Amino acid sequence: MSACESNDLLKWCVIGAGPSGLTALKNLLQCGIQAECLEREDDLGGNWYFGSSTSRVFESTKLISSKSLTEFTDFPMPHEWPAYPDHKQCLAYLHQYSDYFGLREHILFQNSVTRITPITRNHVRQGWQVDLEDGTTRNYAGLIFASGHNH
């Protein structure tokens, strides 16, 4: 089975719309797997979303790895940017990436996950029930956690 083959026709969930969540979402969709992303903030970017309740960057934050080592292989950072972009450029890059690959329409913003429970039938796991802070519940075939190492 290739990396893009799937026998499951149900939707997958990516939790977190930072760099890892965006790439996970893009790859699922490119493989033809139905997917959506749950993001607790009102916009994407994860840690690079300066000023959000979860961001840990400072006003002066810049990449500590060069853009050539940090950029996604299928979406290079602008050539005219410095070798070590600042946090505003990193966030802009993630927005450009999301727009280029059509990810934004698959992201559900301001959705905090409060609980995850396996869905089982006859003692066999069939998927996952995800409870959200607003009281709604969503069911998924699988989950990818991209919520950062502090969450």
Feature map (PLM): residue ranges:
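Core beta-strand elements of the Rossmann-like FAD/NAD(P) dinucleotide-binding domain
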Residues: L10, D131-G142
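Short hydrophobic core segments
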Residues: I15, T137-H151
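Generic structural signal for residues in well-ordered beta-strands
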Residues: A35, I107-F109
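A conserved short coil-to-beta-strand element within the FAD-binding core of flavoproteins
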Residues: F109-G127
